[in-house]
């Protein structure tokens, strides 16, 4: 399936380049987007089946939605290979959905406080784009930062208004740990990027 996907994608790229005059930048963007969609879609199916089987499908959706929007706009650690990307995503999802909420219940006031710090960190050091993706311009960087800021801010608002309803406790814990782990990997990615630039 993967081999057939690559062949079809290469045919599409050749057609865009030869018949429609797409630039190298445009081709790089198309290739990155199509590859990302294929890889992400395959991971989502596997993760959905796994967490659904364990009875955590709703929590999975909460974590997934937050993680997808934050990763798309703010970025973070980008793995070179599918398997390492798969494993990293699994660790983040498993930790935020099952492991950490069972180990520690975080009070709503702490969720709001820590998420506010995470919101500022994401805005200040993001976005960190994949090296396989064309570098974003200043307008796109600002847009991504603002979007990431708004996503976490909306989560904070939800916690502020609905924390008294126990129905949402599980999802607030999952969302909180998802934001914290995303921010942690973003911070690690920033440090790694600085070290790469220093050694270049």
PLM regions: where:
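Hydrophobic transmembrane alpha-helices
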Residues: 11-59, 69-70
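Structural signature of hydrophobic alpha-helical transmembrane segments
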Residues: 50-63, 109-116
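C-terminal ends of transmembrane helices
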Residues: 67-78, 125-134, 187-190
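Interfacial aromatic-anchored transmembrane helix boundaries in multi-pass membrane proteins
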Residues: 72-88, 94-99
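Cytoplasmic-side transmembrane-helix entry/capping segments in multi-pass membrane proteins
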Residues: 80-91, 109-115, 137-143
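Hydrophobic alpha-helical transmembrane segments in multi-pass integral membrane proteins
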Residues: 96-109, 150-167
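Membrane-helix boundary/juxtamembrane motif in polytopic membrane proteins
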Residues: 128-152
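Glycine-rich, aromatic-bearing surface loops/beta-hairpins
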Residues: 142-146, 155-200
């Amino acid at each position: 399936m993967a081999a057939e996907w690559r062949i079809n994608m290469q045919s599409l790229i050749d057609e865009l380049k030869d018949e429609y005059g797409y630039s190298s930048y445009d081709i790089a963007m198309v290739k990155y987007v199509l590859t990302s969609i294929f890889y992400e879609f395959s991971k989502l199916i596997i993760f959905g089946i796994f967490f659904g089987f364990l009875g955590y499908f709703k929590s999975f959706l909460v974590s997934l939605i937050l993680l997808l929007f934050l990763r798309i706009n703010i970025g973070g650690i980008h793995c070179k290979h599918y398997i390492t990307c798969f494993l990293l995503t699994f660790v983040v999802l498993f930790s935020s959905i099952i492991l950490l909420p069972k180990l520690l219940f975080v009070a709503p006031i702490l969720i709001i406080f820590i998420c506010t710090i995470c919101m500022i960190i994401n805005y200040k050091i993001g976005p960190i784009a994949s090296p396989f993706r064309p570098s974003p311009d200043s307008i796109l960087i600002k847009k991504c930062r603002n979007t990431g800021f708004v996503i976490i801010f909306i989560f904070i608002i939800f916690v502020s208004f609905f924390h008294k309803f126990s129905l949402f406790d599980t999802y607030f814990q999952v969302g909180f740990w998802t934001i914290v782990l995303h921010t942690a990997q973003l911070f690690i990615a920033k440090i790694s990027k600085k070290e790469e630039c220093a050694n270049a």
